[in-house]
Amino acid sequence: AFAVLVCCLRATRLPELGRYLLAGSLVLVVCHVIAACLGLHTWWAYLRSTFWSGTGLGTIWYVIQDSSGGIIPGIGWITGTLTVGGLLGLAWLLMTVPRRPRIAQVACVALLILFITNKVYSPQWILFLVPLAALARPDLRDWAVLMVGECFYSLAVWAHLGGLSLPGGSDADVVYWASVVLRLACEMWFAWGVLDDIRRPWNDVVRVGYADDPTGGVLDYAPDPAPEPVEDSSAEVAR
């Protein structure tokens, strides 16, 4: 939703944005109503675990908490503030770059911001990232970096849960902590590559030739009012 919102605002596709938000909101409400009717207790437990639970596996917050042996106070407010701040910063960047970014690029970076800053990072969430990463930056090197981090973490998390990565007589699972840091570092590497393509669209391999946004739907070849260039002070003096 974030990617569609920002890209439609930049392309001034307001009628399409309104229809998308209306349809998406209706689908979300219907799905939650059905889930609540089928199992109210399970539905409420899911909401509680999403918004009011503590830190979860796969996050840097879990590493900090597990290594220090304490509980991070106000973790929900901290992670929420970082996520909102990251998305606002991304929105500002998207409105100021020389060309409207592809919707897959925006969705991929927004998802990575959520994953990196969130207090919960379920293993299955990678299924959301894989197709977006392939569409956002089809670069073999960066894809390999991302997958190495994910594969190493997948092995480490099951070893952690089974107690197989703990040194003899120690409660400090350094191997698992390192896998979390490596995974997040690989994701930040990939996000930086996508952001570089957004900042310098002439280097985007998807836009070679006359392609614009092949998976963007109504945004493909949509009008793109470029931001006003900043006047150089030396040029102003020369005048």
Mark where each language-model region is.
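Transmembrane helices and adjacent periplasmic/lumenal helix-loop junctions
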Residues: 1-8, 30, 116-125
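Extracytoplasmic catalytic-loop and juxtamembrane helix elements of membrane-embedded
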Residues: 35-64
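Aromatic/glycine/proline-enriched transmembrane-helix motif characteristic
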Residues: 57-117, 195-239
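Aromatic-anchored segments of alpha-helical transmembrane domains
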Residues: 27-34, 111-119, 147-160
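Aromatic-enriched
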Residues: 145-239
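Hydrophobic/aromatic-rich transmembrane helices and adjacent perimembrane loops
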Residues: 122-141
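Perimembrane helix-loop-helix junctions
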Residues: 2-26
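Structural signal for the C-terminal ends of transmembrane alpha-helices
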Residues: 5-14, 91-99, 135-138, 192-199
